[in-house]
């Protein structure tokens, strides 16, 4: 049984992940917008785990220039928007992450009515996800 609000857990994950990336020389920011009374449960934990996957991918494939992660609560859903530039050496920015972690999350999330979209345009990686909040 979880007794932590989802918003508190997400904010802690964003702050911790920003600190970790900043310590490794990355520039960027994360923010949480909106309000939710949802509590952390096994489904909502997937949101937190997906955020950790996103930060791992930033660390692996992103240029150390500006990154952005924005999490927004809205109408029984959570939206995640993430952008960064890919490292010059990591031209495979899209293919590496998609085959493993993101594809697993995409299947889980689409099974509950959400979706993940991502693309690489030139050197810019963009990611968008909508996850329903389940109680």
Question: Which residue stretches match the model-derived regions?
Answer:
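Conserved short strand/loop->alpha-helix "switch" segment adjacent to the catalytic nucleotide/phosphoryl-transfer site
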Residues: 24-52
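Short C-terminal beta-strand
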Residues: 123-134
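Solvent-exposed beta-strand sheet faces enriched in polar/charged residues
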Residues: 29-33, 70-72, 119
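ATP phosphate-binding glycine-rich loop and adjacent ATP-lid/helix-beta elements
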Residues: 92-122
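Short helix-loop "hinge" at the ATP-lid/N-box region of the Bergerat-fold HATPase_c
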Residues: 54-62
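Short beta-to-alpha transition helix within the HATPase_c
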Residues: 1-26
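Short beta-strand/loop element within the Bergerat-fold HATPase_c
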Residues: 66-77, 83-84, 122
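Two-component histidine kinase transmitter core
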Residues: 85-87, 132-135
């Amino acid at each position: 049984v979880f007794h932590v609000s989802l918003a508190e857990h997400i904010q802690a994950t964003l702050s911790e992940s920003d600190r970790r990336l900043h310590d490794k020389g990355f520039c960027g920011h994360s923010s949480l917008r909106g309000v939710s009374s949802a509590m952390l449960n096994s489904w909502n934990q997937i949101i937190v785990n997906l955020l950790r996957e996103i930060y791992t991918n930033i660390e692996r494939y992103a240029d150390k220039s500006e990154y952005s992660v924005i999490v927004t609560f809205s109408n029984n859903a959570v939206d995640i928007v993430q952008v960064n530039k890919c490292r010059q050496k990591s031209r495979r920015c899209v293919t590496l992450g998609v085959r493993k972690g993101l594809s697993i999350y995409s299947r889980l999330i689409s099974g509950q009515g959400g979706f993940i979209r991502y693309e690489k345009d030139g050197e810019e990686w963009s990611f968008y996800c909508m996850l329903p909040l389940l109680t």
